[in-house]
Amino acid sequence: IYIIGYRSRKGGRVELDWPEGKKKAASIGRHIQTGVTGHSISHHLQNVYIYKKDDGRPQIIDPSSDFPVKTLVASYHKIQRLTGTFVRDGETGLRLLTADECKAIMGFPKKFKIPVSRTQMYRQMGNSVAVPVITVLAKWIAEELIPNGK
């Protein structure tokens, strides 16, 4: 949810034209990499934590996944079984998302640099906003506050 507030001014209300939603949500599969090493979740952790309880409903994805991914959370690096999204790949058959996959989910350009540790990257991506959404909102705000581009 994004809330935009404007100070009252002459002329009254601010009207925004909301775009039509997409008929189909974007799918994650096209952003998933294969053959990734170094992000694997151990078999032990998979067996005793992720799949142990009935309340755990991790989202398992792969390149053929044709559905939206769960929201990234800042605690993703802690391997949350309730909110986690994991990739069917890697040395143990299950791994965490890569930096490039996280960037794609959040709408960051592929060339965007994240010069921090993997844990910090997960925290930053989980606390981030979707770049395409903010781009549209910023454009609307600019058009409203600066009529006719002046």
What are these model-derived regions, one by one?
Residues 134:
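Acidic-aromatic/histidine active-site loop/patch
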Residues 12-14, 31-32, 97-103, 143-144:
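Short, surface-exposed, polar/charged, turn-prone segments marking secondary-structure boundaries
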Residues 77-116, 121:
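FAD-binding beta-loop-beta segment adjacent to the flavin cofactor pocket
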Residues 138-149:
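Short, hydrophobic alpha-helical segments
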Residues 130:
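A helicase ATPase "motif cassette" and its flanking acidic/Ser/Thr-rich regulatory loops
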Residues 70-74, 103-107, 139:
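Generic alpha-helical structural context detector
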Residues 1-78:
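Class I S-adenosyl-L-methionine
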